[in-house]
Regions:
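Glycan-recognition and catalytic cores of secretory/periplasmic carbohydrate-active enzymes
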Residues: 1-159
């Protein structure tokens, strides 16, 4: 809604309210939602969801300034301090999508130094886990060799 607010203020307000409603639904019914991509013979087996809720809470905090969203963002972030593929040997197709935790990045930029330090440390820990895996690899690559591993590379570089 922030992006559209200067162009379509009424619509931006409406989708901002819908974002809060969708978030509340996620709080009420926690968990991953499996996606079947059309007629493909597989589905996206996403296991994690707290990173999505963390990012949603951070963005809702930024748009509403309601402290309850900041507290929820921190709590969701603590449920998954490191993105699970980091340091792992393998993963299923899209198991830990979107492969990086933007919510950690957003909290790492918090004005609350304690929160900022905690989530920067979490990101550093994930990077260190990948580096430790890389030490065991003849190509110095700590990224699991899986379908879409290029996405993991991009996620690591982004983090």
């Amino acid at each position: 809604s922030k992006v559209l607010s200067g162009f379509y203020p009424d619509f931006a307000k409406e989708i901002g309210a819908k974002a809060a409603d969708a978030f509340d639904l996620g709080v009420q019914y926690p968990g991953a939602c499996q996606t079947a991509p059309g007629s493909a013979p597989y589905f996206y087996e996403e296991d994690n969801w707290v990173d999505d809720m963390q990012l949603a809470a951070v963005e809702l905090y930024k748009s509403t300034k309601d402290e309850k969203y900041m507290k929820l963002a921190v709590n969701y972030g603590r449920m998954e301090p490191v993105t699970p593929w980091m340091g792992a040997d393998s993963a299923r197709h899209y198991q830990w999508y979107p492969f990086m935790n933007v919510g950690h990045y957003r909290l790492g930029n918090s004005t609350d130094k304690r929160v900022s330090d905690e989530f920067k440390r979490n990101m550093r820990t994930g990077i260190e886990r990948v580096f430790e895996k890389a030490k065991e690899n003849p190509f110095l690559n700590g990224i699991p060799y899986i379908w879409c591993s290029n996405n993991l590379v991009a996620a690591l570089l982004t983090q």
